[in-house]
């Protein structure tokens, strides 16, 4: 089994898992709170990262099959764009994790004021 096929499979599973998280939050009214909004943000970042890796693996597979010229202009540009988007997705995931950590901090140390500090309006702005 080729590494591209393994990464392709893992990326597809990652997209599906994050879609399940998004659907669960969207369908269940009890999960539509600021904390779950942050989790959705993380799921979207992770899903985009998986999608970019799927695109990159498709390019590699097409190159290995002879449909793309190795290190041609299109492949190099597409690979650079995909890598840049993947890094942006990674930064989005790190930011989402930081916001989730801040939300948990506020929940623990400012429990009585949590709902006045963390509002949906502020959540959307973040």
From Swiss-Prot:
Transmembrane regions: 1-25, 35-55, 81-102, 124-126
InterPro entries per UniProt: GPCR_Rhodpsn, GPCR_Rhodpsn_7TM, Melcrt_ACTH_rcpt
Gene Ontology biological-process entries: adenylate cyclase-activating G protein-coupled receptor signaling pathway
Keywords: Cell membrane, G-protein coupled receptor, Membrane, Receptor, Transducer, Transmembrane, Transmembrane helix
Localization annotation: Cell membrane
GO molecular function: melanocortin receptor activity
Residue intervals annotated with topology Extracellular: 56-80
Record carries keyword RNA-binding: no
Positions in the Cytoplasmic compartment: 26-34, 103-123
Gene Ontology cellular component annotations, sorted alphabetically: plasma membrane
Record text on subunit structure and interactions: Interacts with MRAP; increasing ligand-sensitivity and generation of cAMP. Interacts with MRAP2; competing with MRAP for binding to MC2R and impairing the binding of corticotropin (ACTH).
Identification of the protein by name: Adrenocorticotropic hormone receptor
């Amino acid at each position: 089994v080729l590494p591209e096929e393994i990464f392709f499979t893992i990326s597809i599973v990652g997209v599906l898992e994050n879609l399940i998280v998004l659907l669960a939050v969207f369908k269940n009214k009890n999960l539509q709170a600021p904390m779950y909004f942050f989790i959705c943000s993380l799921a979207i970042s992770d899903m985009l990262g998986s999608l970019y890796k799927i695109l990159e693996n498709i390019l590699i597979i097409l190159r290995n099959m002879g449909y793309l010229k190795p290190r041609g202009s299109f492949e190099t540009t597409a690979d650079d764009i995909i890598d840049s988007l993947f890094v942006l997705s990674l930064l989005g995931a790190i930011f989402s994790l930081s916001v989730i950590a801040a939300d948990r901090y506020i929940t623990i140390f400012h429990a009585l004021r949590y709902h006045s500090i963390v509002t949906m309006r502020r959540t959307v702005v973040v």
